[in-house]
């Protein structure tokens, strides 16, 4: 007999956890749509030569290739060592680039899309790291140009999503890559690849600490003078406290910009984002400047975002993204700038569960169980269930008569809030008895008013 087991690096949930996960997906989708984003789905696998625009490197080592058994046998016979034709997507950005380039003349720009699908990476399986996981992305793609105003709107989307998820206080930290590039240029760190390497080291500041970054930058491979490294560390230590302080920090930076045009541009862009965020109604307690935010991916060119939970910094980033200049350069001659974010929901859910922050979420999608007292009551139980479902109540029927205590136990274990009972006495009076397991109380209500009464109870519990 084969031992049942799940593959390492996957997140398989029991029904009550799956319901909580699904509700988080629903909240994210609802907020994406409120801001006018359109749904897109792409195939789980892409053509290998389309997906892997860069040969070799860490990305290719983590890609899962797809090959039929027939193709595998043919390759073995012929000695063909070329890459399989298909590969599983490792993020949603590359498929988006292919999608926009392929459908460029059918889409309306700026193109606002959201995508919530699983992606696959062959990482080493360990706690909190997954090989299969959900990403929930939004992007606004322009043609030739895209206003920085969209950067502010994306920040407002982040705020709306995590406000409704109600998983605790959070902070949206933002920066602009142009600030860092301009500042480094003023220190003489202007070479393209060298500057990107420094940015990647700075991005490790929160995880590895200032001493590690200092030692790396003065050491072999960088050899930046200690005095300049201290200036870099002082720059990336900047954090704003409130909206007015954020604008003041930018004003100070602008005054010290000297001849750096790129730094001035970054200041102007970030200032406009801050002003529009305030107009969008995002409270100043929800965001701050953090000049250490660089984002490891090299294609970010302007605004960058990192979102963290205030009371659980150990969880790390729960949402990140930024501005890029040319999404589909590998697939199209058109310039397609954009701005977007991604929520890695599988990892976030796992971290929240580990931190005990999922416990308060209602446990079942079934709202009512119609109990069965005896065989003769089956038609009445089915009629009550029909009425409840017609009234919008998710309802399960007990199909075999059992002791009422066991039916209560079943409902409690399954996370069902209401148990509806209709014995001979209740039927004779045209009422049903309802046991509310959440409030631990029982009441009677007319059969005609049952569904509306339960709807009111459910709505009231949402407000509590």
From Swiss-Prot:
Gene Ontology terms: cellular component: cytoplasm
Enzyme class: ligase
Entry's localization field: Cytoplasm
InterPro entries with a match to the protein in the record: aa-tRNA-synth_II, aa-tRNA-synth_II/BPL/LPL, Anticodon-bd, Anticodon-bd_dom_sf, His-tRNA-ligase, HisRS-like_core, HisRS/HisZ, HisRS_anticodon
Catalytic activity, reaction form: tRNA(His) + L-histidine + ATP = L-histidyl-tRNA(His) + AMP + diphosphate + H(+)
CDD domains: HisRS-like_core (cd00773), HisRS_anticodon (cd00859)
Disulfide bonds: none
Keywords: Aminoacyl-tRNA synthetase, ATP-binding, Cytoplasm, Ligase, Nucleotide-binding, Protein biosynthesis
Pfam families: HGTP_anticodon (PF03129), tRNA-synt_His (PF13393)
Catalytic activity, EC: 6.1.1.21
Record NCBIfam families: hisS (TIGR00442)
Subunit structure, interactors included: Homodimer.
Full protein name: Histidine--tRNA ligase
Organism field: Stenotrophomonas maltophilia (strain K279a)
